[in-house]
């Protein structure tokens, strides 16, 4: 028998059926799910340490190696968003007092600075205005001056729409005995990245962008150089949950019997497995081409409306997330709200430094189609006609 009376009654809202609006997600992520990926989310759960689950985990690792273009044995999934993957990289590689060089040309570089400082690293931001990118010469100056153990670059800066070139940076870092960490959250699956050939030591991505899986899992891979640094550290990582030695064992990366570490998000991993399977069936190069062609079509339609792309150099435009300069006289919030309220299409404003300056339109995975470009540009045309415009 219960010894106390209930003080909290069943919430009335939970006694009603769950209702989800039918909405087209054309922001920087998450993206709408393909039917096969949605179906995977409805499958029955199995034990996290069963042979069947281990098989699924191994298939996911092979899929990650494919989309990352790597043969690294130390390749796995982090149970958490891409922020978790970034923290996993930093908490395992950096020790207090280590020098950490960060390309801070948007919100994700700023987050890397914040996390590095929390870990007691000596953080050296290379700050750029929104829309900027890094050259080999600029990075070499930072490497020579600060002698870091780790350099962070964002491949696809979704807050600014910049695609950071990666060729040559791995070789440059290794010349200075520095590891290269790359954020590819919004780029993997949507634009070329070659982890091994570009000399990237740690690469991570998210499930909910061009890969089209639900949010909540992140992909990460470590080179042998990165593994050596992590496995020879003098102090334990601050986080047990993100300790790579435990995670490597649980994901079958160390050729040892697997030991329980935490309960993985089983249903989310079903969906991730299917998202990687779809890219494998489509072909990675075909996926890149689809995103490139959809982005080019979007850029042309936007410019036909008289809108200006925020990133001026076409070679530096991220194909998965396009940033559009907010047209003079308009409040970006009015445009975003109009497109949502009248067309059930989600686009987003800026994040971090570009807040108030840009609109962000994502063409990610399943959503990267000419039909969706037509829908969002017609919605923008209507918004520009009906939203209030201040006199300049």
Curated annotation (Swiss-Prot):
Cysteine pairings via disulfide bonds: none
Cited InterPro entries: Aminotrans_V_dom, Aminotrans_V_PyrdxlP_BS, PyrdxlP-dep_Trfase, PyrdxlP-dep_Trfase_major, PyrdxlP-dep_Trfase_small, SP_NH2Trfase/AEP_transaminase
Top-rank EC class of the record's enzyme: transferase
Cofactor(s) this protein cannot do without: pyridoxal 5'-phosphate
Residues bearing PTM N6-succinyllysine: 225
Superkingdom of the organism of origin: Eukaryota
Binding of substrate, residues: 360
Record field: catalytic activity: L-serine + pyruvate = 3-hydroxypyruvate + L-alanine; glyoxylate + L-alanine = glycine + pyruvate
Function: Peroxisomal aminotransferase that catalyzes the transamination of glyoxylate to glycine and contributes to the glyoxylate detoxification. Also catalyzes the transamination between L-serine and pyruvate and contributes to gluconeogenesis from the L-serine metabolism.
UniProt family annotation: Belongs to the class-V pyridoxal-phosphate-dependent aminotransferase family.
Listed name of the protein: Alanine--glyoxylate aminotransferase
Organism: Pongo abelii
């Amino acid at each position: 028998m219960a010894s106390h009376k209930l003080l909290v009654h069943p919430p009335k809202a939970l006694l009603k059926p769950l209702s989800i609006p039918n909405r087209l997600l054309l922001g920087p992520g998450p993206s709408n799910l393909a039917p096969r990926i949605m179906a995977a989310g409805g499958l029955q759960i199995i034990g996290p340490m069963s042979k069947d689950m281990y098989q699924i985990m191994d298939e996911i690792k092979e899929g990650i190696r494919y989309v990352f273009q790597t043969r690294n044995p130390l390749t796995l999934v982090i149970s958490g968003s891409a922020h978790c993957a970034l923290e996993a990289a930093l908490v395992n590689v950096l020790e207090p007092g280590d020098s950490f060089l960060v390309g801070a040309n948007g919100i994700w570089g700023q987050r890397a600075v914040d996390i590095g400082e929390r870990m007691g690293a000596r953080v050296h931001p290379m700050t750029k205005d929104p829309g900027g990118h890094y050259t080999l010469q600029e990075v070499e100056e930072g490497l020579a001056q600060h002698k870091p153990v780790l350099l962070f670059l964002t491949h696809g800066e979704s807050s600014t729409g910049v695609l950071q070139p990666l060729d040559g940076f791995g070789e440059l870092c290794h010349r200075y005995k520095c590891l290269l960490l790359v954020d590819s959250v919004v780029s993997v699956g949507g634009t070329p990245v070659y982890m091994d050939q570009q000399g990237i030591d740690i690469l991570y991505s998210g499930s909910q962008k061009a890969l089209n899986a639900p949010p909540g899992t992140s992909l990460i891979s470590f080179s042998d150089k990165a593994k050596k640094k992590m496995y020879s550290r003098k102090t334990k990582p601050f986080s047990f949950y993100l300790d790579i030695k435990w995670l490597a064992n649980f994901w079958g990366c160390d050729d040892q019997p697997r030991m329980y570490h935490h309960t993985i998000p089983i249903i989310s991993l079903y969906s991730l497995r299917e998202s990687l399977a779809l890219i494998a069936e489509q072909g990675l190069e075909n996926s890149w081409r689809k995103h490139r062609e959809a982005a080019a079509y979007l850029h042309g339609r936007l410019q036909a409306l008289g809108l200006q792309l925020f990133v001026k150099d076409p070679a530096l435009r991220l194909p998965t997330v396009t940033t559009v300069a907010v047209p003079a006289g308009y409040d970006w919030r009015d445009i975003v709200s109009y497109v949502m309220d009248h067309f059930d299409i989600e686009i987003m404003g800026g994040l971090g430094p570009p807040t108030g300056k840009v609109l962000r339109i994502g063409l990610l995975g399943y959503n990267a189609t000419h039909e969706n470009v037509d829908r969002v540009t017609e919605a923008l045309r209507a918004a520009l006609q009906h939203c209030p415009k201040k006199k300049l």
